[in-house]
Amino acid sequence: MSKVALITGANKGIGLETARQLARDHGFTVLLGARDPKHGTDAMNQLRNEGLDAHFLHLDPTNSASIEAAVLLVSADYGHLDVLVNNAGVLLEADSAPPPQVPVSVLRDTFEVNVFAAHAVTQAFWPLLEQSSAARLVNVSSWVGSLSLHSDGTFGDYKPIALSSSKAALNMMTVHYAWQWRDSPHRANAAHPDKVLTSGNPHGEISVEEGAKTSVELATLGADGPNGAFLHLGQRLPW
């Protein structure tokens, strides 16, 4: 029986490519979590046309009823979940906006998706993850969530306060999830995909194929893999 992976925000970009690589290179059954049925179905058909075992799962990470329905479907069809990739995320602030000028509403809306929704999905699917022999939880973060790199001047004047704060919070949640699994075969880690060129990031510098690699690596970690780490292509990043 193949392992089952759920990727949120999987109808395009890094999420879709993560699903593709897990199915194509590692034999996973992949569940494409997406809010829009048409976009999710189109993504599923794209992977199926490549001969991959892909299924659309209607999932709005910001909607509790949608999450509950998705959990029931996965439980009924598979009885467990081996991998959860919290890939869904948003960048809502303008690149040039100084932190004091970013509206509170932008922070709230950013946290709603990047933090609260990720926790809601993780919380709901946690029992199914624990039914796996070796679950892998991957939170797609970003190095802009590193307090150390912002403090030492690495990013200069680039201070996207909503995005950075939300990813720092996601990193902290990852550490807490990992602590729950400290004496188990399960693993929880945060991934930095790098500057990926997507519809949501027109300033990206690398392909989605490259950007998905860290998530795939963390989703397929062996028994001796890290737990509670912040990584990019096997390299640890500073918190």
Describe the function of each predicted region.
Residues 26-42:
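Conserved glycine-rich Rossmann-like NAD(P)H-binding loop of the short-chain dehydrogenase/reductase
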Residues 37-38, 58-70:
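The beta1-alpha1 cofactor-binding region of Rossmann-like NAD(H)/NADP(H)-dependent oxidoreductases
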Residues 7-8, 86-87, 136-142, 187-192:
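Structural signature of the Rossmann-like NAD(P)-dependent dehydrogenase/reductase core
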Residues 50-53, 73-86, 92, 103:
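A glycine-rich helix->loop->beta "capping" turn
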Residues 1-31:
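Canonical Rossmann dinucleotide-binding motif of NAD(H)/NADP(H)-dependent dehydrogenases/reductases
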Residues 85, 121-125, 129, 173-174:
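Hydrophobic positions on the long internal alpha-helix
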Residues 168, 183-186, 190-193, 198, ...:
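C-terminal helical subdomain
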Residues 90-91, 95-111, 116, 130-182:
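Catalytic loop of short-chain dehydrogenase/reductase
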